[in-house]
Protein backbone atom coordinates (compact mmCIF):
# COMPACT_ATOMS: atom_id res chain seq x y z
CA UNK A 1 0.00 0.00 0.00
CA UNK A 2 1.28 3.45 -0.92
CA UNK A 3 0.36 6.76 0.75
CA UNK A 4 -0.63 10.30 -0.17
CA UNK A 5 0.80 13.34 1.65
CA UNK A 6 -0.78 16.72 2.15
CA UNK A 7 1.18 19.82 3.15
CA UNK A 8 0.64 19.00 6.83
CA UNK A 9 2.55 15.71 6.48
CA UNK A 10 5.46 17.22 4.57
CA UNK A 11 5.76 20.18 6.94
CA UNK A 12 5.68 17.81 9.91
CA UNK A 13 8.67 16.01 8.40
CA UNK A 14 10.58 19.12 7.31
CA UNK A 15 10.13 20.85 10.66
CA UNK A 16 10.87 17.69 12.68
CA UNK A 17 7.59 17.92 14.57
CA UNK A 18 5.82 15.01 16.29
CA UNK A 19 4.95 12.51 13.58
CA UNK A 20 8.06 13.29 11.49
CA UNK A 21 9.40 9.78 12.10
CA UNK A 22 6.22 8.28 10.66
CA UNK A 23 6.49 10.44 7.52
CA UNK A 24 10.18 9.55 7.20
CA UNK A 25 9.31 5.86 7.44
CA UNK A 26 6.98 6.27 4.45
CA UNK A 27 9.68 8.14 2.53
CA UNK A 28 12.16 5.35 3.29
CA UNK A 29 9.66 2.79 2.04
CA UNK A 30 9.25 4.76 -1.19
CA UNK A 31 13.03 4.71 -1.60
CA UNK A 32 13.57 1.04 -0.92
CA UNK A 33 10.34 -0.83 -1.55
CA UNK A 34 9.27 -1.47 -5.12
CA UNK A 35 5.66 -0.49 -5.71
CA UNK A 36 5.42 1.85 -2.69
CA UNK A 37 4.83 5.50 -3.58
CA UNK A 38 4.42 8.75 -1.64
CA UNK A 39 1.99 10.70 -3.83
CA UNK A 40 1.83 14.49 -3.57
CA UNK A 41 -0.20 16.94 -5.61
CA UNK A 42 1.84 19.81 -7.04
CA UNK A 43 -0.78 22.07 -5.40
CA UNK A 44 0.20 20.74 -1.97
CA UNK A 45 3.87 21.07 -2.86
CA UNK A 46 3.17 24.75 -3.55
CA UNK A 47 1.53 25.07 -0.15
CA UNK A 48 4.65 23.63 1.51
CA UNK A 49 6.78 26.05 -0.50
CA UNK A 50 4.95 29.19 0.61
CA UNK A 51 4.84 28.07 4.24
CA UNK A 52 8.57 27.25 4.24
CA UNK A 53 9.27 30.59 2.57
CA UNK A 54 7.40 32.43 5.32
CA UNK A 55 8.93 30.44 8.18
CA UNK A 56 12.50 29.85 6.99
CA UNK A 57 13.10 32.07 3.98
CA UNK A 58 13.32 31.80 0.22
CA UNK A 59 16.55 29.80 0.19
CA UNK A 60 15.17 26.84 2.08
CA UNK A 61 11.86 26.96 0.23
CA UNK A 62 13.63 27.06 -3.15
CA UNK A 63 15.91 24.16 -2.19
CA UNK A 64 12.94 22.05 -1.13
CA UNK A 65 11.05 22.85 -4.35
CA UNK A 66 14.04 21.93 -6.52
CA UNK A 67 14.76 18.73 -4.57
CA UNK A 68 11.14 17.64 -4.97
CA UNK A 69 10.85 18.62 -8.64
CA UNK A 70 14.19 17.08 -9.63
CA UNK A 71 13.40 13.73 -7.99
CA UNK A 72 15.91 14.05 -5.17
CA UNK A 73 13.11 13.29 -2.70
CA UNK A 74 11.13 10.03 -2.95
CA UNK A 75 7.90 11.83 -3.81
CA UNK A 76 5.64 10.93 -6.72
CA UNK A 77 4.44 14.35 -7.83
CA UNK A 78 1.06 14.55 -9.54
CA UNK A 79 0.03 17.44 -11.79
CA UNK A 80 -3.49 18.91 -11.59
CA UNK A 81 -5.47 18.04 -14.70
CA UNK A 82 -8.85 19.59 -15.54
CA UNK A 83 -10.54 16.41 -14.24
CA UNK A 84 -8.60 16.52 -10.95
CA UNK A 85 -9.35 20.22 -10.52
CA UNK A 86 -13.06 19.63 -11.06
CA UNK A 87 -13.11 16.76 -8.55
CA UNK A 88 -11.27 18.92 -6.00
CA UNK A 89 -13.67 21.81 -6.61
CA UNK A 90 -16.63 19.49 -6.04
CA UNK A 91 -15.14 18.47 -2.69
CA UNK A 92 -14.70 22.15 -1.76
CA UNK A 93 -18.33 22.83 -2.71
CA UNK A 94 -19.55 20.09 -0.36
CA UNK A 95 -17.17 20.26 2.62
CA UNK A 96 -15.65 22.96 4.87
CA UNK A 97 -12.07 22.25 3.83
CA UNK A 98 -9.24 24.40 2.50
CA UNK A 99 -9.06 24.31 -1.29
CA UNK A 100 -5.46 23.04 -1.31
CA UNK A 101 -6.50 20.16 0.95
CA UNK A 102 -9.13 19.08 -1.56
CA UNK A 103 -6.32 18.21 -3.97
CA UNK A 104 -4.74 15.87 -1.41
CA UNK A 105 -8.10 14.23 -0.72
CA UNK A 106 -8.86 13.91 -4.44
CA UNK A 107 -5.46 12.36 -5.09
CA UNK A 108 -5.80 9.87 -2.24
CA UNK A 109 -9.20 8.88 -3.62
CA UNK A 110 -7.89 8.55 -7.18
CA UNK A 111 -4.86 6.48 -6.19
CA UNK A 112 -6.94 4.52 -3.65
CA UNK A 113 -4.37 5.04 -0.91
CA UNK A 114 -4.62 6.53 2.60
CA UNK A 115 -3.89 10.20 3.19
CA UNK A 116 -1.26 10.91 5.84
CA UNK A 117 -2.25 14.10 7.66
CA UNK A 118 -2.96 15.65 11.02
CA UNK A 119 -5.29 18.29 9.60
CA UNK A 120 -8.52 18.28 11.65
CA UNK A 121 -10.54 19.44 8.60
CA UNK A 122 -10.17 15.91 7.23
CA UNK A 123 -12.07 14.20 10.10
CA UNK A 124 -15.49 14.84 8.53
CA UNK A 125 -14.45 13.40 5.17
CA UNK A 126 -13.04 10.31 6.87
CA UNK A 127 -16.23 9.88 8.93
CA UNK A 128 -18.28 10.05 5.74
CA UNK A 129 -16.16 7.29 4.23
CA UNK A 130 -14.57 9.39 1.49
CA UNK A 131 -11.05 8.22 2.27
CA UNK A 132 -8.82 6.36 4.69
CA UNK A 133 -6.53 8.49 6.85
CA UNK A 134 -3.25 7.77 8.60
CA UNK A 135 -3.39 10.28 11.42
CA UNK A 136 -0.30 12.24 12.40
CA UNK A 137 -0.21 14.15 15.70
CA UNK A 138 -1.87 17.56 15.50
CA UNK A 139 0.49 20.47 16.12
CA UNK A 140 -0.18 22.85 18.99
Which role does the model predict for each range below?
Residues 69-93:
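Acidic catalytic patch
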Residues 2, 71, 75-78, 105-140:
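Acidic, PIN/NYN-like endoribonuclease modules and their adjacent C-terminal/linker elements
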Amino acid sequence: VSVCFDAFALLTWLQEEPGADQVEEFLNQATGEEGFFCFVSIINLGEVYYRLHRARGAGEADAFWEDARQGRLPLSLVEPTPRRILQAARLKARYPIAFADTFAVQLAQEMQVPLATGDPEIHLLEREGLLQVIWLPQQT
